[in-house]
Every structure is written in structure tokens, then in C-alpha cells.
């Protein structure tokens, strides 16, 4: 059996999957669970989900548990993290002033060149003064990033060593070279900055998971979904938590792929997960999820974190509705649950209840206080400028149904506008899927695939505005947890060989060494080395590994070739281990 759990900002969802085929490859959904996320007590939320799922398993033989979460992503979007200091070693040729995104920034002398050779040493006095400045401000989080550190991490390691020797009180530290094997100094420092920023949040998350499993005496493999739709073991998450920052949207996309026929039918579609806090938007092109191999963006900053293409709109069923200067405003804040469930502010969920769109839903029926929803909306309408919202009044009286309809129209208009902006931004650009680069492809979605609590109510309305066919994903309220449960483990390894300098780098494995006497490589051998190390790091000698990038060029000196520089990236491609019974064919 497999358990998938998605820890969202509003709800924690879970599914229990059991094998239903003789060869052990097919799965069926045995049980589901959905509880409110208690941010100050994650262990309790996870335990509540586990208890429901384990109770449904007559013989709880759990082989694998996979989790996804939006907690870290929400922290970044809301900028609700502790200050981070940046130690930058940029070297020549780049004005670093526009890179200073830390709460305190140190620019150091010394640098590594593009061949990985240390050209200039660090100046220790300069470094110590900078660290003292960060310490004086009480900053506990630090990111250390040197240009070309993937080709020689020596300067980053030297800074870390001095911090430890002097016993500086930094609690969370990221080194740029440990987060990606690819070049890109600006992207690397942003990646290191946000990796440090979410370390505390992820440490709490990992500890909550470990305690929950210990409470229920579960001794099994535990994984976390990454941004690229693959998984990483829980005990390795803290090596680079930034890789899982968008695991919530990735779970939605993988769940859509698992539970619908979009992949089999090679369709181009928009995927929506309408949650309580956000609406996550994904894109399928000819049946495969769109991919960002250069790196996702976080708060408008490009990173080196490879991931599925997604955009989280801070708009959901529990978004706070307010009136500012006589105008209606929905989100981005969430002020608790809907008024119908005891929350302090009206929300789109209250409007849906007033319109009787979700009244018969088992999750709302009998629990929702419809009168509280009505009263919250009536109180809100009193502050509106009637000249702009005339349709909501009839003969000087508020038409509550019309007002609720206006709220939902405004919410849908925001989602539709964002989808159209996404498609316009991709027009005439090369796009990637998890399998290939597509050049010159027209992205013309005809299908809308929706999941989340209000999906059944909102999907037809959205599809009408977009002019698409629509389909509510089976098990729409927990399909994200299905996507997490069935995601395949993934891994990427970068190998760089410089035969002229006689040096070998296996970046993600932390290997940077001189070539031994008689040790030589051609491009094919570098590819074999990259694939072998990918399997080794995944601890799976049977894993299917592919070469995602390769380059090779001669090193010329004095009009003659003195060696080659070869760089190869190998990866286990993201995908599903199976599709569950009951999904669309």
C-alpha cells in the first residue's frame, strides 16, 4: 500500500492506494481523508489524516508514504520568513549591485575563473568585518555564493570553515554549489537565498512528519514531492529544501496526469487546483506537463530549481473579501475559514453557498451556517460605492443573490485573466515538456481540468468564459494527494571533465578532484559516468536514466588543441509509477 498526503495552507488531504493487479503495478484508491491544516500543530493534522487512512487498511502494510506541501511556498509568497544575509563572491565582469537581495549583503574580493581555477584569495579581514555586521543585526540565516563555485567550491567552503572556527551563531546556512550543478550566478544566489529562508519551515515540517510516523509506529520509506514532479527521501530534504518549494502545485499537476486521460489523449489543457488559499495553474502540452528546465521563478526572481510550469494565484475559496475605497477586493489574504464556518470575514465560499452552488456537497451540507454567510455579505455590501455596483441593488435594496454572483464573476475573471496572460507570455517562445523542447508549437488549449473543493461548482463557469471543454478531475478534492503518492523518484547529476586542466567534477555528489594518472575521458564515457552516478545517488541500479544536456568543446592554446571540456547532465525523468483504477482512460 501507498499513502499520499498533501499538506496545504487550508486543508491536509490524504489517500490510501492498494495494489489491484497480479504484477503489483496497478493501484486502486482504498480511502481518502481531508482535514483542516493546523499550521501551529502540523503533526496533529498529519496524524488526523493518517488515522483515517490506516483505519481503512485491514492489514496496514504501508510500503511508501509521499508528502507534498505548499507551506514553504506560502511563506515565500507572503515574505513571512526571517531575515537572510548574503555573502557574495562575484569576481570581475559583473556589476553585483542589482544582485543584493539579502537583508544584509557582503561583497568579497577573491574569485574563481570559468575554468575553476582560484585566481585570487579571499581577504579574511574583509570577510570578518562583514560577518560581524550580519551578526550585529541579529541575522541567523546565511547564504554563501561564489561565481563558478560548481567548478571549484573552495571559496564557499573557506567562508563556511571560518564561520565554524569563529563559532558564529548562524542557524541556517546554504552554499550555492550544493544546490545545482548548472551555471548561472544570479540564479544561484537567488536559489541559495530562498533555500536558507525556508530551512526553518521545512525543519519543522520534517520533524512533524517524523513524530507523526513515530506516534503510529510506521517504519516505512517516506518521500517528499519536488518541484519537478519527482520525489526525494525525507531524510535528504534538508540538503536542498528549495527543490520541494513548489511541491503543492506539482502534486496537483501529477494528480491531473494520473486521474485523467490528458496524457494518453495527447491533449493541450489548462489544469487548475482551486484551493482555500491559492489557485494553482498548470499547463499540459500535447499531454505532457510544461516544464521549466532553466528554473522556476519565486516572487519574480529566477532560480536554478528545475520544476513543472505552474503559477500560484493568491485567490481561493477562503480568500478574504473586503471593500477598500468603495471597491470590492478579493484576497490575497486569507483570514481564516468562510464566515459560514465561523470565520471572521466573508469569502467566495460564502458567496457560493448563498448561490446554492455547493449546498449539497457532503463537505458543506449540514455544517455550513447559511445565515452567517448571508449576514457577512450583507454587512460587506454596505461599504460599496453604489454607482459602480448598480447591478447589485434593486429599488434601493441589496439583491444578495446578484451580489454573490458578482463576487464569483470577479473571482473567475481574475483566474481567466491570469490564464490568458500565461498563454500570451509563452507565445512565440520555445517551450519545454518533461520529455522535450518544443520549438514553434502553438499552445491552444481546448480543455480545462479542475480539482479542489469548489471545482464542481466553478469548472463549468470558468470553461464557458474560456471557451474550453471542461472536466472535473476524479477524486477532485484529494487528487493532489494521489499525484504525490504515485510520483516517481527523480534525480539529476552533472559531470564536467576538463582534460586540459586535468580535472573532474561530479557536482551534486560533491566530487571535485584532479584526474588520476592515465585517467582520460571522451564524451561517451562522460555520459556513462553521469548515468552511473545518477543510479548510484538514487540507490537504484535499475533506474531508467536519460541524458538531458550535453556539450563538448576543444581547449585551444597557441593554435593547437590541448584538451577538451565536456559537460553532461543525466536525470531520472519525472513521471508516474502507475495510474489508479477508476482514472479516465
What do the PLM-derived regions correspond to, one by one?
Residues 1-585:
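N-terminally biased helix-coil "hinge/interface" segments that flank
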Amino acid at each position: 500500500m501507498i499513502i499520499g498526503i498533501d499538506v496545504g495552507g487550508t486543508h491536509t488531504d490524504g489517500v490510501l492506494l492498494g495494489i489491484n493487479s497480479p504484477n503489483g503495478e496497478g493501484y486502486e484508491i482504498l480511502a481518502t481523508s481531508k482535514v483542516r491544516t493546523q499550521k501551529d500543530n502540523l503533526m496533529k493534522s498529519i496524524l488526523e489524516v493518517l488515522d483515517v487512512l490506516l483505519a481503512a487498511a485491514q492489514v496496514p502494510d504501508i510500503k511508501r508514504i509521499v508528502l507534498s506541501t505548499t507551506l514553504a511556498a506560502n511563506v515565500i509568497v507572503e515574505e513571512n520568513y526571517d531575515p537572510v544575509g548574503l555573502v557574495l563572491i562575484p569576481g570581475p565582469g559583473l556589476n553585483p549591485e542589482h544582485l543584493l537581495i539579502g537583508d544584509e549583503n557582503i561583497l568579497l574580493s577573491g574569485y574563481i575563473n570559468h575554468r575553476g581555477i582560484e585566481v585570487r584569495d579571499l581577504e579574511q579581514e574583509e570577510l570578518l568585518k562583514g560577518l560581524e555586521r550580519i551578526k550585529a543585526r541579529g541575522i541567523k540565516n546565511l547564504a554563501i555564493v561564489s561565481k563558478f563555485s560548481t567548478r571549484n567550491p573552495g571559496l564557499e567552503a573557506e567562508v563556511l570553515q571560518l564561520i565554524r572556527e569563529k563559532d558564529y551563531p548562524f542557524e541556517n546556512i546554504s552554499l550555492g554549489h550544493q544546490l545545482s550543478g548548472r551555471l548561472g550566478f544570479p540564479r544561484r544566489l537567488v536559489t541559495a537565498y530562498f533555500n536558507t529562508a525556508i530551512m526553518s519551515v521545512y525543519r519543522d515540517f520534517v520533524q512533524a512528519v517524523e513524530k507523526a510516523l513515530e506516534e503510529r509506529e510506521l517504519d516505512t520509506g517516506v518521500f517528499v514531492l519536488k518541484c519537478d514532479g519527482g520525489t526525494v527521501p525525507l531524510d535528504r530534504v534538508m540538503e536542498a529544501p528549495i527543490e520541494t518549494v513548489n511541491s503543492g502545485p506539482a502534486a496537483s499537476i501529477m494528480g491531473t496526469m494520473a486521474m485523467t486521460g490528458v496524457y494518453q489523449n495527447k491533449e493541450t489543457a489548462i489544469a487548475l487546483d482551486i484551493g482555500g488559499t491559492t489557485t494553482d495553474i498548470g499547463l499540459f502540452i500535447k499531454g505532457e506537463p510544461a516544464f521549466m528546465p532553466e528554473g522556476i521563478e519565486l516572487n519574480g526572481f529566477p532560480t536554478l530549481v528545475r520544476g513543472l510550469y505552474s503559477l500560484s494565484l493568491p485567490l481561493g475559496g477562503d480568500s478574504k473579501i473586503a471593500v477598500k475605497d468603495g471597491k470590492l477586493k478579493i484576497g490575497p489574504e486569507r483570514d481564516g475559514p468562510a464566515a459560514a464556518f465561523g470565520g471572521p470575514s466573508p469569502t467566495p465560499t460564502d458567496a457560493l453557498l448563498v448561490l446554492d452552488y455547493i449546498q449539497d456537497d457532503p463537505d458543506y451540507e449540514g455544517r455550513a451556517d447559511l445565515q452567517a454567510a448571508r449576514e457577512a455579505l450583507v454587512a460587506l455590501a454596505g461599504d460599496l460605492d453604489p454607482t459602480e455596483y448598480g447591478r447589485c441593488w434593486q429599488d434601493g435594496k441589496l439583491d444578495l443573490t446578484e451580489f454573490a454572483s458578482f463576487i464569483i464573476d470577479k473571482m473567475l475573471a481574475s483566474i481567466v485573466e491570469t490564464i490568458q496572460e500565461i498563454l500570451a507570455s509563452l507565445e512565440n517562445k520555445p517551450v519545454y515538456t518533461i520529455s522535450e523542447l518544443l520549438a514553434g508549437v502553438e499552445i491552444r488549449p481546448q480543455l480545462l481540468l479542475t480539482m479542489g473543493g469548489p471545482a464542481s461548482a466553478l469548472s463549468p463557469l470558468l470553461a464557458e468564459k474560456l471557451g474550453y471543454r471542461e472536466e472535473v478531475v476524479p477524486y477532485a478534492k484529494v487528487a493532489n494527494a494521489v499525484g504525490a503518492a504515485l510520483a516517481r523518484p527523480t534525480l539529476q547529476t552533472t559531470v564536467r571533465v576538463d582534460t586540459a586542466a586535468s580535472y573532474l567534477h561530479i557536482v551534486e555528489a560533491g566530487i571535485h578532484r584532479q584526474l588520476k594518472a592515465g585517467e582520460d575521458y571522451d564524451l561517451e564515457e562522460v555520459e556513462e559516468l553521469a548515468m552511473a552516478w545518477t543510479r548510484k545517488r538514487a540507490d537504484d541500479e535499475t533506474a531508467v536514466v536519460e541524458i538531458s544536456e550535453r556539450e563538448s568543446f576543444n581547449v585551444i592554446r597557441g593554435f593547437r588543441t590541448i584538451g577538451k571540456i565536456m559537460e553532461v547532465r543525466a536525470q531520472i525523468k519525472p513521471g508516474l509509477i502507475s495510474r489508479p483504477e477508476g482514472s479516465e482512460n
